[in-house]
Amino acid sequence: MQVAVPAQTTVELCSTEAQAILSQENCIAIFGSNQVAAEGVLAANANLNVLGSDAANGDVIGVGFDAGSIIKAAVQDGTFLGAVTQSPLMMAYYAIYALTAAANGQELEDVPTDGYWYDSTNMDDEEIAPNLYD
């Protein structure tokens, strides 16, 4: 396992780090841990063309986190196996809940924020589609 963190979070710098990882002969998978990092992985792949969803055929499996249009397109076309998306509706709900509780002097606790795995087979599902924002 190798972890790479660029000095700044830009698609270009994430792409440089991802290219270094994807160029290694023994690379079997890569994860972009946020929208910028995932888009960096995809930008790196534009030069290398190693990502896909068929590990048995030698593809490097790519997975991302978030749901911007670039990541969704990569999931739809099979460049990424899938990605994890957040629930913006529930994040906003819990933010308002916490703000109201704080304004009323109540003690705050950690709140859950759900994440959902999506791939090309479930992007239109009732539970997933509302969370695939741009």
PLM feature spans:
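Short, glycine/charged-enriched secondary-structure capping and boundary segments
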Residues: 44-47, 76-78, 98, 132-133
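Hydrophobic alpha-helical
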Residues: 7-73
